[in-house]
Amino acid sequence: MTIFNSISSISNPTRTALSSINTYNYNGSSVNDNSTAYFDNDFGGWGGLGNFCNGNGCGGGSSNVNVINLDIDIGSRRHRRCC
């Protein structure tokens, strides 16, 4: 069973800041992810900390972004145990 907790906050329309605090529980292993992304018309790109777009940021710009829905795929976060 996967537990997903997310807290997001959005500021003004010109500069949109999205911060998420996520807690995952996948196959008995807990993973904490703190990531922050900024979307700015003047910035012309996405900047992130943590595991947002693999921690490297995303290429490509966004303009006039007011509402952002961020879904993090945790399908690849499998805790593998060897014998």
From Swiss-Prot:
In the record, the note on similarity to other proteins reads: Belongs to the UPF0512 family.
By what name is this protein known?
Answer: UPF0512 protein W
Species this protein is from: Dictyostelium discoideum (Social amoeba)
